[in-house]
Design a protein with these regions (language model features):
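Cofactor-binding loop segments of dinucleotide-utilizing enzymes, especially the Rossmann-like FAD-
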Residues: 58, 89, 167-170, 201
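A short small-residue
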Residues: 51-54, 164-165, 199-206
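N-terminal secretory signal peptides and thylakoid transit peptides that target proteins
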Residues: 6-21
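Short beta-strand elements in bilobed, periplasmic/extracellular small-molecule ligand-binding domains
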Residues: 83-87, 193-201
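N-terminal beta1-alpha1-beta2 submodule of the flavodoxin-like/Rossmannoid cofactor-binding fold
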Residues: 17, 21-131, 137-153, 208-209, ...
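Short, internal active-site loops enriched in acidic
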Residues: 92-93, 171, 204-205
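Short, glycine-/small-residue-rich phosphate/pyrophosphate-handling segment
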Residues: 158-197
Length: 226
């Protein structure tokens, strides 16, 4: 029975993956009408609810613009009384998934590395926040490596959670946001998570450029309001 469940989970995963690939491939053909001006939030329906939050950062630049967003988000969440853990994918040792399937989508991974920290905190987390720069129209390789390893804990995180996306990129074309936004949306749909807010920041490239914008304050407000 356990083997049969694993096979069915894998089929569901593959089906969702194919849907995501098709969606991302198609999204770059559309003219973007996506807003980059503000954070979109879903108010917390439970007054004074305190959450466990895991923030996954993916910028290899220590003082990168997406890291700045993450830091302000964390400060806002802590001020609201939430318990926050940050995992920096860029400075951690996480081996890429090699599709060996030894984990069976719900078991120990063959690689014993820093992903164990993610496993420890993401399973009980009420909200998972992703912070990444756009690299070649996708999320950073460092963050993608961590997300790929979700495969080994699929059965434990395929439960209702909230999620937040914070993304920065250098140009000013909303159309270029589409691949990452589509990826994020399909990921949440597959996992059964609910979007709690997004902060998408165009036109920032040099380190520190985001400090001259209103977006760090928006990240703080989002962290405080989730």
């Amino acid at each position: 029975r356990k083997h049969r469940r694993s096979v069915m989970n894998r089929r569901t995963f593959i089906k969702a993956s194919l849907t995501a690939t098709a969606a991302v491939a198609g999204s770059v053909l559309l003219d973007g009408a996506l807003s980059s001006a503000s954070a979109v939030t879903v108010p917390n329906t439970t007054e004074d609810a305190k959450m466990k939050i895991l923030v996954l950062t993916g910028s290899p630049r220590k003082n990168g613009n997406s890291n700045t967003l993450a830091e302000h988000f964390i400060n806002g969440a802590k001020e609201a009384g939430h318990e926050v853990t940050r995992f920096d994918a860029a400075s951690s040792k996480v081996h890429p998934c090699i599709a060996c399937n030894k984990c069976g989508m719900n078991g120990p991974c063959m690689f014993k590395d820093d992903f164990e920290v993610v496993r420890e905190h993401i399973i009980p987390a009420d909200l998972v926040a992703f912070a990444t720069p756009m690299y070649y129209f996708g999320i950073s390789a460092q963050l993608k490596t961590v997300i790929d390893r979700f495969y080994a804990i699929n059965g434990e995180i395929h439960i209702p959670k909230k999620a937040v996306l914070m993304m920065t990129y250098a140009n000013n074309s909303p159309r270029n946001e589409s691949p990452i936004l589509t990826y994020y949306e399909v990921l949440l749909e597959y996992l059964g998570w609910k979007d709690a807010g997004r902060i998408i920041v165009p036109g920032v490239w040099p380190t520190g450029a985001i400090n001259q914008t209103p977006f760090p304050a928006q990240a703080f407000a989002l962290g405080k309001s989730v």
